[in-house]
Swiss-Prot record:
Source lineage: Eukaryota, Viridiplantae, Streptophyta, Embryophyta, Tracheophyta
Subunit details: URED, UREF and UREG may form a complex that acts as a GTP-hydrolysis-dependent molecular chaperone, activating the urease apoprotein.
Source superkingdom: Eukaryota
Protein name per Swiss-Prot or TrEMBL: Urease accessory protein D
InterPro entries given in the database record: UreD
Family of this protein: Belongs to the UreD family.
Entry-linked PANTHER family: UREASE ACCESSORY PROTEIN D
GO molecular function: nickel cation binding
Gene source species: Oryza sativa subsp. indica (Rice)
Alphabetical keyword list: Chaperone, Nickel insertion
Family annotation (Pfam families): UreD
Function: Required for the maturation and activation of urease via the functional incorporation of the urease nickel metallocenter.
Length: 306
């Protein structure tokens, strides 16, 4: 029954990728996609010495229209390294008849393998409805990087948190047992709009790091985030000293980026960082800095400066 279900899921998928070792290098041995998804596996991406495979997921027309359902499976073989990214933000267009735009990704990461899912953000247009689910199957020595993030919309044009519905679910299963379960939901309310709740912030992001190869990146990110936030959230002091009666601002300026890190799993083998920021570029800078240490594994830095 499980085999039949897997075959049925594969048949319904709009995309399927398999990465295996070929002559000592990670290579894409299967790459299938159909409308509205397009997958590109460039032969040259990053330094050849890294031996990693790269994939670009693209939608026709640069976005997902109302009612579209994109379903993709990824299998990263034992000892392989693969990165899956995009060429620009994923645009989600206005919902028609309240139909959601959906994306589903199911990835299996082999033993001693590395899979990095490092897309650009999702940008939902006014009145859009979007739902995505990502499921990752791992082993105790698998290595996984997941960046899941979205923006308020075309906020530079004044369109800010005007979409109707956004939901993102991430599950990590360790040998088919739940290791990490996360869900983010933003929905317009009659009492408070999304814009009311998010105030001046325009970006929400989550970064998951799991596996023995990524422990040093976890430790560095946790240390630097702790230092950054201790400075940004430190109460302001006046020139008059600790006991000065000089008035402080009633509404102190909020920091342009807020981040936190939390371990998960047995012995803290995984870490999740959560970020919210005023600008997309500040999150790009955060990701570029903290994920630069992936270059030896992937042959290139994620989110390079344009």
């Amino acid at each position: 029954m499980e085999a039949e279900a897997a075959m049925a899921a594969a048949a319904a998928a709009t995309g399927a990728v398999r990465v295996e070792k070929v002559r000592g290098r990670s290579a894409v041995t299967r790459c299938f996609a159909k409308y509205p998804l397009k997958l590109i596996a460039p032969s040259k991406a990053g330094r050849a010495s890294s031996g990693a495979a790269w994939l670009y997921a693209i939608t026709y027309g640069g976005g997902i229209v109302s009612g579209d359902i994109i379903s993709c499976t990824v299998a990263v073989g034992d000892g392989c390294a693969a990165a899956m990214t995009t060429q620009a933000s994923t645009k989600v267009y206005k919902a028609v008849d309240s139909k959601c735009s959906e994306q589903v990704l199911e990835a299996r990461v082999g033993e001693d393998a590395l899979f990095a899912l490092i897309p650009d953000p999702v940008t939902c247009f006014s009145m859009a409805r979007y739902h995505q689910k990502q499921v990752f199957h791992v082993f105790p020595n698998s290595n996984l990087v997941v960046v899941d993030w979205f923006t308020s919309g075309r906020y530079e044009s004044g369109e800010k948190w005007n979409f109707s519905f956004y939901k993102s679910i991430n599950h990590i299963l360790l040998e088919d047992q739940p290791l990490f379960i996360d869900s983010v939901l933003l929905e317009q309310s009659s009492n408070f709009s999304i814009a009311d709740r998010m105030q001046e912030y325009n970006v929400v992001a989550m970064v998951i790091l799991l596996g023995p190869k990524l422990k040093h990146i976890q430790d560095q990110m946790q240390d630097e985030v702790k230092k950054m936030m201790s400075v940004q959230l430190r109460p302001p002091t006046s020139a008059g000293g600790r006991y000065s009666t000089r008035s402080q601002p009633l509404h102190p300026q909020r920091p342009p980026i807020i981040a936190s890190c939390s371990p998960f799993g047995r012995m803290g083998t995984g870490m999740v960082a959560r970020i919210t920021a005023v600008s997309t570029e500040s999150v790009y800078s955060f990701l570029r800095h903290h994920l630069a240490a992936l270059e030896p594994f992937l042959g290139a830095c994620p989110y390079p400066a344009s």
